[in-house]
Structures are given as C-alpha cells and as structure tokens.
Regions:
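Extended, low-polarity transmembrane helix blocks
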Residues: 1-88, 95-169
Length: 169
C-alpha cells in the first residue's frame, strides 16, 4: 500500500521532490568541490587499507582486497570517476532527470564509501536513496523524467505510454 502511494501519488511526488533536491545538492556540491579543488583518492584508499588490518578491523577483508588489488592500482580512474559521478548524480537528482539511475549510482557510491569505513552521512543518504529508488518514475514526476522517460520509451523501445505495439503477421 505504501509502495503504491509512493509510486503513484502526486503528494508523494512533491515530498520526493524535496528529498530528491536535498540529496542531489549534497551529491552535487561534494562532486563540485572535488572537481574544482583537486582530488586524489589514493590517500583515502590507503586509509581504507589501514582500517582493514589490526585486531578489530573496521573494513572487511574482502573489501580491503578489492581496494589493494583493483582500486589503488587504478587510482587515476577513480580520481575522475568519483568527482564526476558525484556531480552527475547530484545533477540528475536535482533536475529529476533519469532519477532512478542517479539514485542507483548514488547508492553504489554510498555503499563503496560505507564499506571503506566512512560513516559520516552515508546512512541517511542510503535511506533517502532507497526511498527515491523505490518510488521509481514518480520521484522525477516534478522534474525532467516527466518528459524524458516517455521520450526514451518511445524512441528507444518503440513504446508509447505503457502499451507495446504487437507485431503483425
């Protein structure tokens, strides 16, 4: 019942607008700060590795192995991906364009930071991200999704609205 209300009601779309813009602002400003002030992820990754050792490690062994074997050797990629990812997730959420994709990729980053031992505001951002994701297209009803999603359905999937055209014999 709540999920249906979240996905179809215009009042919930208004509430989601406020939540979406707040979360988008947090993402966009974090990304913008990294883009304009310079960003090097290697110190963060080394700190994550340090948290994966010791008597009571904060970071799980498997995540530490991922950081050591993949993320740290590819720090140059992450130096671009993290700031641009944060900025674009924020922009998508604020504009309400490709909202569920933006929320999904925001959640991916939140969990990566969380697995790395960074608590800060990740739990509240994760909760908000899941609410937006659960709302589906209604999260972007008061935003670009209202026009972009029907356009994508029509042009990419050859569908108008919810009806599929059936092939003729």
């Amino acid at each position: 019942m709540f999920n249906r209300w979240l996905r179809t009601n215009k009042i919930s779309a208004g509430i989601l607008l406020v939540l979406r813009v707040w979360l988008g602002w947090k993402w966009m400003t974090a990304g913008w700060g990294k883009l304009t002030d310079g960003f090097d992820v290697s110190g963060y990754l080394k700190g994550t590795l340090a948290k994966a050792t010791g008597e009571k490690p904060v970071v799980q062994e498997w995540w530490g192995s991922f950081i050591e074997g993949f993320a740290l050797p590819n720090a140059g990629f992450f130096n671009l991906a993290i700031p641009w990812g944060e900025f674009l997730v924020g922009l998508g959420l604020i504009l309400g364009t490709l909202t569920t994709a933006a929320a999904f990729f925001g959640l991916m980053m939140n969990f990566a930071f969380f697995f790395s031992g960074t608590i800060s505001n990740n739990p509240e951002m994760i909760i908000c991200g899941f609410i937006i994701l659960a709302a589906g297209a209604n999260a972007g009803y008061f935003g670009g999704d209202r026009w972009v999603l029907p356009f994508i359905k029509e042009k990419l999937f050859n569908r108008k609205g919810q009806h599929r055209e059936t092939p003729t014999a």
